[in-house]
């Protein structure tokens, strides 16, 4: 690794891969004959960790649960992971990069995987909207600050 690379702010994608993907449609084939009135629940979370100096892993976990008339139609989980080289960022910049920028890179891959799994399950196409990870990161940061101050004031 070049010395110059370690002395300036740098970001590189080293690898993007699926760690885990699952699709469950426990009520098939009967669910295909029922009225289609989907209720979609969507959850996501990220976990990041340092693997080596300047090498970080971000795991974006996306879960979609679809019910129709109280019946589980399908459940889809995807853990989309990226390994990134990141150098010369201060602590706050690194947190922002791992909590917002990296998940933003990973989400289109996870969305494509989920869409494919749903299609292969013979269900109508599921197009997940883009996510504003920057907004989520800022809200979580603000919430953590508020919780910290509330605990300090007790």
UniProtKB/Swiss-Prot annotation:
It is found in: Cytoplasm. InterPro entries: SecB (IPR003708), SecB-like_sf (IPR035958). GO terms for biological process: protein folding; protein tetramerization; protein transport. Pfam families: SecB. Keywords: Chaperone, Cytoplasm, Protein transport, Translocation, Transport. The keyword Transport applies. One of its GO terms (cellular component) is cytoplasm. One of its GO terms (molecular function) is unfolded protein binding. Belongs to the SecB family. Homotetramer, a dimer of dimers. One homotetramer interacts with 1 SecA dimer. One of the proteins required for the normal export of preproteins out of the cell cytoplasm. It is a molecular chaperone that binds to a subset of precursor proteins, maintaining them in a translocation-competent state. It also specifically binds to its receptor SecA. This is Protein-export protein SecB. The lineage of its organism: Bacteria, Pseudomonadati, Pseudomonadota, Gammaproteobacteria, Enterobacterales. The gene is secB.
